[in-house]
Amino acid sequence: MREYLNNIKRSFKWKHFVNYIVVASVLVIFTVLYYAGALNRSLPSLLNQIGYSILLAVSLNLVVGFLGELSLGHAGFMCVGAYLGTYLANLFIAGGMPPMLALIISMLIGGLAAAVLGFVVGLPALRLRGDYLAIVTLAFGEIIRNICRNLPMFGGALGLGSSLNDAVNGKQIPPLFIVSLVLVLIMLVVVQNLLRSKHGRAITAIRDNEIASKATGINVTFYKLLVFIISAFFAGIAGVIYGSGVSPVLYTNFDYNYSIEILVMVVLGGMGSLNGSIVAATVITVLNFYLKSFLTGDMAAVKTLVYAIILIVMVIYKNAPALKNIREKYDIKKLVTKIIPHHKRESYVRDDEARWDVVTTKISMNEVLSTDIVVQESVTSPDKPDKPQSGSNE
C-alpha cells in the first residue's frame, strides 16, 4: 500500500501535472459554457468525440508505444463495449433504472467484457511478434465486428438503438463530453501511476529487450497480458461512451480502417508519449469532424483523400528542424523548471540519480553473477581432448 501511494505521489510531480491541468481546465471551462448556454449544438458532440478518441489513443499507446507490440484490432474491443454496453443500458433503463446509473454500470460491464476478451485473445496472440501479431489482431477485430452484426440481440445489420442517446437528448443525464473527459482524467492517473511503478519499468524493459528481460527474471507473458487487458478495458469503456452518443450503433463503424486511424493517432503523437497521444487524438478528431462538415454532397468522396494528404504533411513536418526548434524553445517542462526554485530542482536530480544508481547496481550485479556462472562452468567442465592435427603421425 505504501508503494502504491508513493507511486501516486511521484505521478503528480510537476512534470507530470500538465496533463491533468489541461484536461481539467477544458472540462471546467466547457461545462460552465454549456450550462450557461454559450455552446453551439455541434461542440458538445465534438468534445465527446475528442474524449473517447483520447481514451482509445492512450490505451493503444500502452501496447504499441510502451510494450512495443503492434495491434491492429483495437476497434474490436471498442465494438464489444459499444454493443454490450448499449444493450445492457437499454435493459436497465427499460427496467426503471435511472439513466446515469445505467450508464455507469454499462461502462463497467462493457470495459470488463472487453478486458476478458483481451485476455482470451492476448494469451495465444502475444506469443507472436511483429507482423504475425498484427495479422492476428486484425483478424480478431473483423471477427468480433461480424459476430456483433449477426447476433439478433444486437439488431443485426440494422444496428442497435440506444436508450442512453435518448436520455442524453432529453437531458436526463449530463452531456457525454463531461463523462468522457472525467474518464480521461481517471485513465491518466491509472496509466501514469502504472508506468512510473516497478511494473512500468518492467514493461519498458520488455519493449527494449525481451530476451534480456526474461534473463533477469521478468515474467514477460504476465506483463504483456496485463498491458493488453488494461488497453482493452479502456477501449471497451470508450465504446460504451461512443454507443451512448449515437443511435443506432452500427457494425460498419468498427472496421479495420478505424483501427488504423487510432494507430495513426499513436504514431503521429509519438509512440511512448502520453502527451503526444492526447494532442494527436484531438487534432485528428477535429480534422475529421470539420472535413465531414465542409465536404458534403459530391465532395464527400474526396474526404479520405484530403484527410490522407493532411496527415502526410503533418508527419513530414513534424520532424522539420524549424518545428523542432520551436518545440525546444517553448517546451513546457523547461518553462516550469525555470519557475521551480533551484534547491527543489537539485532534489529532483538527486532522487533520479539515486534511482538510476540502484538500477545500474542491479544490472552490474547481474553481469557479475552471469560472469561467475560462466567461469564456474568452464572450471568444472572436463577438459576436452585436442583434435589431432591433420597430417600428424599416430
Give, region by region, the residue ranges found by the protein language model.
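Transmembrane alpha-helices and adjacent helix-loop boundaries
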Residues: 1-394
